[in-house]
Amino acid sequence: MTTDRRKLLAAMGALGAVGVMAPWAMAASKIKPGSKSVLIAVDVQNCFVEGGTLPVAKGSEVVPVINRISTAFENIVVTQDWHTKGHASFASAYDGKKPFETTKLSYGTQVLWPDHCVQGTKDAELHKDLSLPSAQLIIRKGYHPKVDSYSAFMEADAKTATGLSGYLKQRGIKTVFVTGLATDFCVAWTAMDARAAGFEVYVVEDACRAIDLNGSLAAAWKNMAAKGVKRIQSADIQVG
């Protein structure tokens, strides 16, 4: 302990300030999103919650959290997985392949999923309780039949942009807050691509849920941290 800290503690004791926390021990102030911040709600769809075709455990629990913190944001973007029938990411498109196995596509290794979020189906609709009336944009992704898309910013081939980066930059957005499903896939890819595009990025952990396939959640957090993505809780955001 430094001399200055000893003096401060001694002074507090002399004033009867027992139990008062020293300034450097106090919690950081809450984050207040401004006009240059955006909330992205990733793939909060029927297919990814209980009863869907590719359910994420406790996926519906993100809905009230996202609804609550959304009131702190002027700018909101929603993404929607929007696959064609027989999509290249579906295990059913290959003889002898099962969901969660992998295959090689032109852009690299692809996890094969159960058929999910097929365009125009109820399964692909946004969760009925997701309430984001001030959302300004819906990004539909994964609609190219031969290319999967986890990120809101870039297709899985790492060369086909969705246009979201340009849209946000035109509006002066500097900071991105990512929520939704699933933490270790679409949320993580969105967060890392946002960092690559030059944005400050926060992932709101309790506003996300993960698939956690063969350690994918721990790997995702590690990869996000390495890219400079910050991990926070919804309580860290000033609402109201």
Give the location of each predicted region.
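Short internal beta-strands
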Residues: 77-80, 202-207
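Structural recognition of alpha->loop->beta junctions
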Residues: 131-132, 215-240
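N-terminal export signals
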Residues: 7-27
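Histidine-anchored nucleotide/phosphate-binding helix
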Residues: 188-196
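C-terminal segment of N-terminal export signals and the immediately downstream linker at the start
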Residues: 1, 23-41, 45-48
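Active-site alpha/beta core segments
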Residues: 64-175
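Short, flexible loop segments at boundaries between secondary-structure elements
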Residues: 205-217
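Acidic/histidine-rich helix-loop elements
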Residues: 49-58
